From Swiss-Prot:
Protein's UniProt name: UPF0248 protein TON_0940
Protein species of origin: Thermococcus onnurineus (strain NA1)
A matching Pfam family: MJ1316
Family: Belongs to the UPF0248 family.
Membrane-crossing residue ranges in chain numbering: none
Amino acid sequence: MRKGSVKEVLAKLKYDPREDERDYYIIIEHRGAYGDVKKIPVELIELGHGYFFVGDAQIPYHRIRRVVKKDGKVIWETRKDRRGESD
């Protein structure tokens, strides 16, 4: 699993030419969705200072639970998810 903030991990996936952002997605906390989580491809997000954007929607970084490669490998997750806790 990669180290650093989720914003740093996403910036690397989006801007590092060695990575293909199409190979990754994020899982966000999204109340009302099935299981209160939503899956978003990294290629659809734009990074901001305290938020990221999906179309016109502005979403705070703290809503991101995991960053996952399409093969299922978790490359970043919140500390509470690493401990096996869930909300």
